[in-house]
Amino acid sequence: MSTDNKQSLPAITLAAIGVVYGDIGTSPLYTLRECLSGQFGFGVERDAVFGFLSLIFWLLIFVVSIKYLTFVMRADNAGEGGILTLMSLAGRNTSARTTSMLVIMGLIGGSFFYGEVVITPAISVMSAIEGLEIVAPQLDTWIVPLSIIVLTLLFMIQKHGTGMVGKLFAPIMLTWFLILAVLGLRSIIANPEVLHALNPVWAVRFFLEYKTVSFIALGAVVLSITGVEALYADMGHFGKFPIRLAWFTVVLPSLVLNYFGQGALLLKHPEAIKNPFFLLAPDWALIPLLILAALATVIASQAVISGVFSLTRQAVRLGYLSPMRIIHTSEMESGQIYIPFVNWLLYFAVVVVIVSFEHSSNLAAAYGIAVTGTMVLTSILSTTVARKNWHWNKYFVALILIAFLCVDIPLFSANLDKLLSGGWLPLSLGLIMFTIMTTWKSERFRLLRRMHEHGNSLEAMIASLEKSPPVRVPGTAVYMSRALSVIPFALLHNLKHNKVLHERVILLTLRTEDAPYVHNVRRVQIEQLSPTFWRVVASYGWRETLNVEEVFHRCGLEGLSCRMMETSFFMSHESLIVGKRPWYLRLRGKLYLLLQRNALRAPDQFEIPPNRVIELGTQVEI
């Protein structure tokens, strides 16, 4: 989104507040409570409060302000961000072996996101609804049912799109951040001593005083920066400057004031540790604050759900996930999409998590491993981009990487302590997604290599057909072709069984480029191979929708006229069997067969009218 128009900058910045900062903006609901709840062997003590506040403040400065907003966001692919984009950028100017390692890192990072995204809606909404414990303690048993009801409504409206409702997100989140600031400032004024925690010396003293326990406590501190990846992932929607402007002018000051306000409250009233966020508010404001918190957490959950849809589309288009139905919910905004399978699978997982963990404090134990793991991978990938793509001095890049890892690795290591108490959940989900993505990519590559290794040369085949033509029938036939130099299987089988050929044959290749968008000038390349054969290569970015009708329109503009309803589309449908393999590769082969059976069929994927498609089967051993 362009920010060149100065009049639109405030609107874009406001929109960024509504979408990008939902997750990190709702962290004050539970972060300080988890830090000082007594689980680490110490309670609400002055040194502990100052230590945690200092750690939270400097994490927000170093990780969010310096690492992500200043450094990582420099790495963009035509304005787009995200872990898979970073993976693609990092592998552009490296050796094949290094690229493979970087791809694995990127896929692990993407898998971590899938693992963590199940927890975010659950912990956010539950922590807001838990404000009922303060307003009406007798309603404690309603927290789980109400959380499920709220999230059920949220997942149900996804198919209708969030365009209209989304217009309310920005003002609601702006109100949320202003309330955070006011509540915090009110408490700080009553006890300004808490501002001493801005001094990083208190963070150092915290480690010296509490020793090993302080290291484990980092697992709770990291809750303050969950959602930081959204800043980079949503860069393509809003642009770098509005996201940075929103952070430094609204979000960061509001978060700092609220965290320090909670700290000031706890110094005077240690018993407020039950729920320091809601106890910041006067009694008359509790119910309005509860409603606002519920709205803010729903918006944070919406941002995460939209992020899952975007990541899934990117993974599908880059060939790491099987094709699935992707529905555009807005004619104006290409980023607003709905993926039914992902939506309801995520909903089911979130409900199971809520019922299983019952309280946001229990969920906090599962939160953080995937976030910090992604942070480590982001540090490695982004510094690789700085060295290989930007050609920065290798010693300077090494210093940056060391500085990042000196923060990331301790945070990740501290979260490993959560493994048995809930951290296994996002790791298990991430492992499942990593297995699915690597299986689809590698087995798909094996299949295509198997199909093409004995394929006939395109040029030789066309020359033979022109010299000794079979029976020609009127009309145009389009054969979907994956490889430019090999005759499509469907063409070979049509000649073998029907022994006829249309008077005009088009070999169509649809290609996804490593970029979010492809300019219309480069959309279609046409090459006449013989008097009756044409090759058409259509290129799309991974954020664009493959559309054969649009390709035909572009072909018509360049002199190759085609009418969709007068053209026959020939496609090959592979029936796969798993050959002799070691047991673990047989399992992977079985998983690939399952994924392919449930994948979206090519006619639906490319938006081709079903009555114009002829599928010819072939059996392939993998």
Curated annotation (Swiss-Prot):
Q: What is its main location?
A: membrane
Indicate yes or no for the key word Transmembrane helix: yes
Membrane topology term: Multi-pass membrane protein
Q: Which GO terms describe its cellular component?
A: plasma membrane
Recorded GO molecular functions are: potassium ion transmembrane transporter activity; symporter activity
Catalytic reactions of this protein:
K(+)(in) + H(+)(in) = K(+)(out) + H(+)(out)
Q: Where in the cell is it found?
A: Cell inner membrane
Q: Which UniProt keywords apply?
A: Cell inner membrane, Cell membrane, Ion transport, Membrane, Potassium, Potassium transport, Symport, Transmembrane, Transmembrane helix, Transport
Give the superkingdom in one word: Bacteria
> Which residues form each disulfide bond in the chain?
none
Transmembrane parts of this sequence: 9-29, 49-69, 103-123, 137-157, 165-185, 213-233, 247-267, 276-296, 337-357, 363-383, 396-416, 419-439
Pfam families from the entry?
K_trans, K_trans_C
Q: In UniProt terms, what function does this protein have?
A: Responsible for the low-affinity transport of potassium into the cell. Likely operates as a K(+):H(+) symporter.
Membership in a protein family? Belongs to the HAK/KUP transporter (TC 2.A.72) family.
Query: Which protein, by its recorded name, is this?
Result: Low affinity potassium transport system protein Kup
**Gene of this entry:** kup
